[in-house]
Regions:
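Membrane-interface amphipathic segments in extracytoplasmic regions
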Residues: 1-238
Length: 238
């Protein structure tokens, strides 16, 4: 199967952020002649699925990794972002902590304290529970071994869901499906200015069992990940 077989008019990349969604945007956009949007707003997802001939792309990631990456990505933004859910009245999240230049000079343990002081730790769950309500895919099994799946929705709409951790094993499928020569992994932490600070932060942060359980032991994670993968995520952080 390839994207042209779906007979769609537009692509909406709609994710909870920090799941490589920008990589899909920059990889697809040059070769796809029709409309491509990149959002994190579930109201946009809902409105799109009321139309027809759309492909939705959504990704999921270990939420512990995602939360750390989200903190580093948004801590300098002095406005509400596009992470819009019914839980925040579709107003987005305010994540400002400090200018990005200050982040590089701030003690890592102080950054960890600032990370825990913000209010957005469990909005990942809000996003996906509402996502399930909108898409109604929960009764269709997801292939956890493969880690990428296309669902057929009403009105010739389609939903592609991918697991972030399995992108590398699905590169051939992704490149073939979208008729692209290379999948560009943008926003890779290893090439960002704050890569050393980011790595030290992840090495030093301690996430207690309550924090990890609230994000990992959920119907969301059990739908997309095997028990073994979830247990591995638990062990990844002290």
């Amino acid at each position: 199967m390839r994207i042209e077989d779906l007979n769609i008019d537009s692509v909406l990349i709609c994710t909870p952020a920090k799941v490589a969604s920008a990589s899909f945007l920059y990889s697809i956009q040059p070769s796809f002649s029709k409309k491509v949007q990149h959002r994190h707003c579930l109201e946009t997802l809902k409105n799109t699925l009321q139309g027809e001939n759309n492909l939705i792309i959504t990704g999921i990631r270990n939420p512990l990794d995602r939360n750390v990456s989200y903190f580093f990505q948004h801590c300098h933004l002095e406005h509400h972002n596009d992470f819009k859910t019914s839980a925040n009245n579709y107003e987005g999240e305010y994540c400002y902590v400090m200018p990005r230049e200050e982040l590089l000079e701030t003690d890592t343990l102080e950054l960890i304290n600032l990370f825990f002081s913000h209010q957005n730790h469990f909005s990942f769950n809000d996003w996906f529970y509402e996502f399930f309500e909108i898409t109604k895919i929960v009764d269709t099994a997801f292939d956890k071994n493969v880690g990428i799946q296309i669902y057929s929705l009403p009105n010739n709409n389609y939903l592609m869901v991918y697991v972030y951790e399995k992108i590398s094993t699905n590169l051939n499928f992704i490149q073939s499906f979208f008729n692209i020569k290379e999948f560009r992994h943008d926003n890779n932490s290893s090439i960002l200015k704050h890569k050393t600070k980011y790595k030290t932060f992840k090495d030093l942060i301690v996430l207690d069992d309550g924090y990890k359980t609230k994000l990992l032991n959920t119907p969301i994670m059990k739908y997309f990940y095997s028990d073994e993968a979830i247990e591995e995520f638990h062990r990844k952080y002290k």
